[in-house]
């Protein structure tokens, strides 16, 4: 099994993700090779919470240019995690 901190990369802090926190939904960037079960197990191991549901979205790379040099952004994978009603909140989002 992989280390849980390799699966969960960073929290996503946007206006929409902050509004979803009232419904106990938290948003994270995750490893592109991870699946829903790995994301659930990693969050339960790192933060000690109970996960009810995991939704995952894939973002394709976008073409970008800097002057005459063209390239692509990195592909991303984002997970929206819903906690159970009796679960505690994730502390990483408290001061934001």
UniProtKB/Swiss-Prot annotation:
One GO BP annotation of this record: translation
Gene3D superfamilies from the UniProt entry: 3.30.70.330
One Gene Ontology cellular component annotation held by this UniProt entry: ribonucleoprotein complex
Keywords: Ribonucleoprotein, Ribosomal protein, RNA-binding, rRNA-binding
A Pfam family hit: Ribosomal_L23
GO molecular function (one): rRNA binding
Function comment: One of the early assembly proteins it binds 23S rRNA. One of the proteins that surrounds the polypeptide exit tunnel on the outside of the ribosome. Forms the main docking site for trigger factor binding to the ribosome.
Matching PANTHER family: 60S RIBOSOMAL PROTEIN L23A (PTHR11620)
Assembly notes: Part of the 50S ribosomal subunit. Contacts protein L29, and trigger factor when it is bound to the ribosome.
Family indicated by similarity: Belongs to the universal ribosomal protein uL23 family.
Name by which UniProt lists this protein: Large ribosomal subunit protein uL23
Protein source organism: Bacillus anthracis
């Amino acid at each position: 099994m992989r280390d849980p901190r390799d699966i969960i990369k960073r929290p996503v802090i946007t206006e929409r993700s902050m509004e979803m926190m009232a419904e106990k939904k938290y948003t994270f960037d995750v490893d592109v090779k991870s699946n829903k079960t790995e994301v659930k197990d990693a969050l339960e191991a790192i933060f000690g919470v109970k996960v009810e549901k995991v939704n995952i979205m894939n973002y394709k790379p976008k073409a970008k240019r800097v002057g005459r040099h063209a390239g692509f952004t990195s592909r991303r994978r984002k997970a929206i995690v819903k906690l159970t009603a009796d679960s505690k909140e994730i502390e990483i989002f408290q001061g934001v």
